[in-house]
């Protein structure tokens, strides 16, 4: 009937902490990296660590910790000082007390600290209480004065590396535009600090991909890659609000689906994520152009690391059923795999896709594979890649 007093020591065993760190490393997503500001170069001697989530151990544990013990959590500030303090001088000035803080008096102190640094590391996002079951928000912008903080830091002219800790995709387009790099860690957990520090300083290479679509603004929601096709198929590059002439005719914009003030593309598509290295996809080869319902489609392609770092790419396979008895999604993720490559290394990657996995429920609620034409993409995200085609026959 009593708690085993030895359990906490088991829970925070070295192997478990290492697993927590590995999970945080592999789930962090590099969304932007202009001029390869990351990983931080050896020429960087001073970093300014700012933001309300730079040293908030409870908040980085996430939504479902309940009675989690924050004393075992290592924050980014603590990790950077401990692991890289011998290489860089760390100046800490949070600017805001917590993520919902509207008090702007501390921003000037953060800006002063940033002016003394070579690079600014800004840790923003949302407290864990703002996410989770029954914790909905109508506004997905950064809470409090965090946007003002990022804007003020950007005015220093120093490169801003924005690290976002959050439980959902926030609408950070404005902040991303002001940042040289953006790393999205979600709520990274107990070992989030060391994981983020190693990613920033290049001991680890980002490999995470967006598990959801990031909208430009809340008006784009619902925004997801696997939406059904419609009688007005969406066009990615459409007329925006500023381009419409005065007294334009009602039919002048056509009949496709798009937002006049935002276009159709999201801020970041499903499956998106950058690396410190680059990858090249070779031509996709199919085992057959025509298959029967009991067949297995073999998909092969070459993947090459064309950059300077060893890295891991998450290669993704998408399929589209072009015509069905009911409306089908424009794309569906069917396979993905992590491929680790050294600089210059090339591997042949193989996906096996049984035709039976192309089944869906028809109007009679029968699970069926319908004959017809299909499109297939192998790509780095849900909006990339060249289409190849195959056919399913009876």
Predicted regions, residues:
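Secreted, periplasmic, or luminal enzymes acting at the cell surface/secretory milieu
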Residues: 1-62, 68-77, 81-86, 91, ...
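Intrinsic-disorder/low-complexity, polar/charged segments enriched in Ser/Thr/Lys/Arg/Asp/Glu/Gln
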Residues: 296-300, 346-350, 385-387
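Surface-exposed loops/turns
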Residues: 144, 293, 343, 370-371
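Short, hydrophobic/aromatic beta-strand segments
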Residues: 310-317, 328-329, 362-363
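Intrinsically disordered, low-complexity Pro/Gly/Ser/Thr-rich segments with frequent PxxP/GP/PP motifs
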Residues: 325-361
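Terminal connector regions
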Residues: 354-394
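Hydrophobic helix-and-loop "lid/oligomerization" segment in the mid-to-C-terminal part
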Residues: 10-13, 91-178
């Amino acid at each position: 009937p009593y708690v085993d007093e030895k359990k906490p020591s088991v829970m925070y065993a070295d192997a478990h902490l290492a697993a927590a760190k590995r999970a945080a490393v592999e789930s962090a997503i590099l969304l932007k990296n202009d001029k390869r500001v990351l990983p931080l170069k050896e020429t960087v001697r001073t970093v300014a660590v700012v933001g309300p989530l730079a040293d908030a151990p409870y908040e980085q544990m996430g939504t479902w910790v309940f009675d989690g013990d924050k004393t075992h959590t290592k924050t980014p500030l603590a990790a950077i000082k401990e692991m890289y303090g011998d290489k860089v001088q760390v100046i800490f000035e949070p600017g805001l007390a917590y993520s919902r803080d509207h008090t702007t008096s501390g921003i000037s102190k953060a800006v002063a600290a940033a002016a003394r640094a070579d690079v600014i590391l800004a840790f923003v996002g949302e407290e864990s209480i703002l996410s989770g079951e029954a914790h909905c928000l109508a506004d997905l912008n950064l809470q409090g004065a965090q946007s003002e903080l990022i804007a003020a830091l950007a005015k220093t002219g120093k490169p801003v590396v924005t690290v976002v800790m959050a439980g959902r995709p926030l609408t950070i387009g404005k902040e991303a535009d002001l940042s040289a790099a953006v790393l999205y860690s979600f709520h990274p957990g107990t070992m989030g600090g060391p994981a983020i520090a190693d990613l920033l300083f290049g001991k680890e290479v980002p490999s995470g991909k967006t598990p959801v679509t990031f909208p430009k603004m809340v008006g784009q929601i619902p925004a997801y890659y696997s939406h059904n096709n419609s009688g007005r198929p969406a066009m990615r590059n459409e007329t925006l609000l500023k381009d419409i002439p005065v007294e334009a005719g009602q039919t002048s914009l056509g009949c496709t689906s798009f937002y006049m003030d935002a276009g159709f593309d999201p801020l970041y598509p499903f499956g998106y994520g950058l690396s410190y290295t680059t990858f090249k996809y070779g031509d996709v080869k199919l085992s057959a152009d025509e298959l029967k319902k009991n067949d297995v489609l073999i998909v092969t392609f070459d993947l090459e690391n064309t950059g300077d770092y060893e890295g891991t790419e998450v290669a993704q396979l998408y399929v589209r059923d072009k015509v069905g008895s009911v409306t089908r999604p424009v794309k569906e993720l069917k396979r993905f795999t992590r491929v680790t490559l050294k600089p210059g290394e090339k591997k042949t990657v193989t996906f096996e896709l049984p035709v039976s996995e192309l089944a869906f429920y028809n109007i009679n609620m029968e699970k069926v594979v319908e004959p017809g034409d299909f499109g297939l993409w192998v790509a780095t995200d849900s909006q990339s890649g060249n289409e190849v085609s195959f056919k399913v026959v009876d």
